Design a protein with these regions (language model features):
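N-terminal transmembrane-helix/juxtamembrane module of multi-pass inner/ER membrane proteins
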Residues: 2-45, 59-135
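Membrane-embedded catalytic cores of phosphoryl/pyrophosphoryl-handling enzymes
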Residues: 5-11, 32-34, 192-280
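Hydrophobic, membrane-inserted alpha-helices
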Residues: 20-29, 46-52, 135-140, 164, ...
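Alpha-helical transmembrane segments and their membrane-interface exit regions
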Residues: 45-55, 70-77, 163, 262-272
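Structural signal for the C-terminal ends of transmembrane alpha-helices
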Residues: 49-60, 142-149, 224-228, 269-275
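Central hydrophobic cores of alpha-helical transmembrane segments
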Residues: 70-71, 157-163, 234-241
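Membrane-interface loops
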Residues: 75, 81-113, 145-231, 276
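Hydrophobic, aromatic-enriched interface-forming segments
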Residues: 125-156
Length: 280
């Protein structure tokens, strides 16, 4: 295929997201090759799948390419500690804590639950924090099942940009977050316990700053206001609950959430500002 045709193909949001994903898989796979060769082979398979999704013309590669960024995001998030180890990166919590004190005068993740020691508030905020997980998949999939391919492709690209930016920062300048450093005073309850159990099973140490939860939720909110405004209003509320709930529960520093929100705004705004070739 001529170079001009390839460039034209990658001007589409769908194919650009797949190219970005393939590039990330290539770099991170090389970093993991020496210590985790099987994982590196899985990355190579992911690159091949993304390439197939870009250049394949039948229904199967098109569908796989459409959904691939959504499917692999949780897996790549789980690899973050391995990348930190491969790079030998040190944690930067002391620096982030200085920013926290400069901005707030104290550590919100330590004091917010003591200011609002109400079990009902605690359960609401932890429920809001857990709403992040459906917020990853529901907005784009609603567009997909309705056949709104342009909105779907742009939404998935915004999500992919947010995730890749976060994963790179996590690997190079990891931050543990307050969950590993002190015990919060959030009131106990079933939703609180469920949240803690999910994080214990699936969170990645070093992936606190910027908050990928906040970056993705805010990016999804901005994209939803463009393509499905009623859902955008709901996601705006979810974004607030994710931001406050993460700090209230002692999972993130306040500046993690601010940085994540700004990142989400930037990537979603950039996607909406670009004039895309909707063929890809």
């Amino acid at each position: 295929m001529p170079a001009t045709s390839v460039r034209a193909l990658l001007r589409g949001p769908r194919n650009f997201a797949l190219a970005l994903l393939a590039g990330y898989l290539a770099v991170s796979g090389l970093m993991l090759a020496a210590t985790h060769p099987r994982l590196a082979l899985m990355h190579a398979a992911g690159i091949a799948t993304a390439t197939w999704g870009v250049f394949g013309r039948s229904a199967t590669p098109r569908t796989i390419g459409d959904l691939l960024p959504l499917l692999v995001a949780p897996i790549l998030y789980g690899e973050v500690p391995l990348l930190i180890g491969a790079l030998g990166s040190s944690f930067h919590d002391v620096r982030v804590q200085r920013w926290e004190l400069a901005m707030f005068g104290q550590h919100p993740s330590r004091v917010l639950a003591t200011i609002m020691p109400n079990a009902a508030w605690s359960e609401l905020l932890h429920t809001g924090y857990l709403a992040y997980y459906p917020a990853i998949f529901v907005p784009p999939l609603l567009l997909y099942v309705r056949g709104e391919r342009r909105g779907f492709a742009q939404t998935v690209l915004a999500l992919t940009l947010a995730y890749v930016a976060c994963w790179v920062i996590f690997a190079v300048a990891p931050v543990e977050g307050p969950r590993y450093l002190w015990t919060p005073d959030a009131p106990d309850g079933p939703v609180r316990r469920l949240t803690v159990a999910i994080l214990a099973a699936g969170s990645s140490r070093g992936a606190a700053f910027p908050s990928s939860h906040m970056a993705v939720t805010v990016a999804q909110t901005v994209m939803a206001f463009r393509w499905q405004p009623k859902l955008g209003a709901i996601l705006a509320l979810v974004s607030v609950l994710v931001g406050v709930g993460a700090v209230y529960g002692g999972f993130h520093y306040g500046v993690d959430m601010i940085a994540g929100a700004l990142l989400g705004l930037v990537v979603a705004g950039a996607v909406l500002l670009v004039r895309w070739n909707d063929e890809g």
